């Protein structure tokens, strides 16, 4: 039986314009990389909001979020000692294959679930490609976990251009790709990996209501033998094999 | 203390049931609550054949509610009987199956198919478009409600519940048509038709354009309609629409609903059904009420 958790905020800081990192106590179930939490936004929104597990260690959970609306705005104003109401961890996370040459690809705030993954993946070789528009964040936490490449579309930091150009260059040197970010990036990852016959898992996002698989609100189209079907991003995902997703 | 109520042939241990479309087939919520505590479970709507449902996005949050455009995704009646019903039968809770069809014949077909052990009731979703009448919902036409109810009534030995749509001019006429057709009970309301626009794309949020509005935003509408229906029919009424806590539930019971269904609240708080049951018990203790039936219909006007 799963229980509603109350979690005390330990820290909540802005790490880029509109991007925050919040750490809170967590005495619940240990998360698997790629899983998410449903967090009550304190009466500012009707529905809870899904947030990827960014990091977890010794009863401390961290989430990364971008302020997009009333809910996340309210979260951004929470202080140390405030109490969150949370259910989770939810969902089907990354399937970690050991001993592989791994490429982790993140785009913008989509890098959120990838830090915990980078810590947990037991790779023979780990490459990390992080793409941003202009302003970067959290890169320092990935340093030391693997070989990190940073791209910015505007060329403000690291390599100028899309992160997918890095993937195209490196795809021949890896056995599996894990990706999370904007839909166009994920679609490109699908194309690149399928062309190179390399395994690829992507973490998807969709509006959610129940977060546990009952309402069928967060539909995602997936390939089937005879056409397609809709899977639930919250329960069957958020991580899917890239080859099965129909964009 | 007695919380037991009767809806047709179904004896519920308490008046709190789940609303169709918000509880799946019970598997997911069984990880959160003891399903045995529920008065009954109304499972998601079934159709004759499997339905994929509508493309995403299917959800849009509104002030105090949500719009949904799920499109009745379900595995079909046969797969339900084969794969989901055995799971539900492992609990001591009455199972009520919501059925959705495109023609009267489809409703009858499913009612016959579901006349089996383990199922206690059939809830007819008359909010479906009738393809033989240009897509007009069955539930807006009293004659259609009567016709479908009468035929389903003949097709099954189970308790027949007709679920009414609120998107009508006079809900009382619709309720009377269902009763006349032989319904054992009426449940209402289904969702209120609504719409939202994506201001960036300047397109409706849903590919289907229209979605169903539910949540606490619609509770005043639901309560008013339950009140109206209770005054014109003799059969039990199951009230639903925006119930979020035991106080909301009591409002419906006081107005005259024999049971209440919890829907959208399940998304916000997977524990809400058992919390509502506990809240009602506490209210009864505090007010020295021994029998839930003392509360039902006790409104003073």
Swiss-Prot record, chain A:
Domain FAD-binding FR-type: 2-96
Biological function: Responsible for channeling the electrons from the oxidation of dihydroorotate from the FMN redox center in the PyrD type B subunit to the ultimate electron acceptor NAD(+).
Sequence positions that bind [2Fe-2S] cluster: 210, 215, 218, 234
Pathway: Pyrimidine metabolism; UMP biosynthesis via de novo pathway; orotate from (S)-dihydroorotate (NAD(+) route): step 1/1
Assembly notes: Heterotetramer of 2 PyrK and 2 PyrD type B subunits.
Gene from which the chain derives: pyrK
Keyword annotations of the record: 2Fe-2S, Electron transport, FAD, Flavoprotein, Iron, Iron-sulfur, Metal-binding, Pyrimidine biosynthesis, Transport
Molecular function as annotated in GO: 2 iron, 2 sulfur cluster binding; electron transfer activity; flavin adenine dinucleotide binding; metal ion binding; oxidoreductase activity
Family per similarity comment: Belongs to the PyrK family.
The protein, known as: Dihydroorotate dehydrogenase B (NAD(+)), electron transfer subunit
A GO BP annotation: 'de novo' UMP biosynthetic process
Cofactor requirement: [2Fe-2S] cluster; FAD
Residue runs in coiled coils: none
Note accompanying the cofactor annotation: Binds 1 [2Fe-2S] cluster per subunit.
Amino acids binding FAD: 49-52, 64-66, 71-72
UniProtKB/Swiss-Prot annotation, chain B:
Name of the gene encoding the protein in the UniProt record: pyrD
Job description of the protein: Catalyzes the conversion of dihydroorotate to orotate with NAD(+) as electron acceptor.
The protein's enzyme class: oxidoreductase
Entries under CDD domains matching the protein: DHOD_1B_like
Co-factor note (free text): Binds 1 FMN per subunit.
Keyword flag Kinase: no
Protein name, UniProt field: Dihydroorotate dehydrogenase B (NAD(+)), catalytic subunit
Enzyme Commission code: 1.3.1.14
Sequence positions that bind substrate: 44, 68-72, 125, 190-191
Keyword Chaperone: no
Entry's localization field: Cytoplasm
Family from the record: Belongs to the dihydroorotate dehydrogenase family. Type 1 subfamily.
GO cellular component: cytoplasm
Pathway of action: Pyrimidine metabolism; UMP biosynthesis via de novo pathway; orotate from (S)-dihydroorotate (NAD(+) route): step 1/1
GO annotation, biological process: 'de novo' pyrimidine nucleobase biosynthetic process; 'de novo' UMP biosynthetic process
Cofactor(s) the record lists: FMN
Sequence positions that bind FMN: 20, 44-45, 98, 125, 163, 189, 215, 241-242, 263-264
GO MF entries: dihydroorotate dehydrogenase (NAD+) activity
Record key words, sorted: Cytoplasm, Flavoprotein, FMN, NAD, Oxidoreductase, Pyrimidine biosynthesis
Catalysed reactions, semicolon-separated: (S)-dihydroorotate + NAD(+) = orotate + NADH + H(+)
Complex formation: Heterotetramer of 2 PyrK and 2 PyrD type B subunits.
Organism this protein belongs to: Caldanaerobacter subterraneus subsp. tengcongensis (strain DSM 15242 / JCM 11007 / NBRC 100824 / MB4) (Thermoanaerobacter tengcongensis)
Superkingdom as given in the UniProt entry: Bacteria
Active site: 128
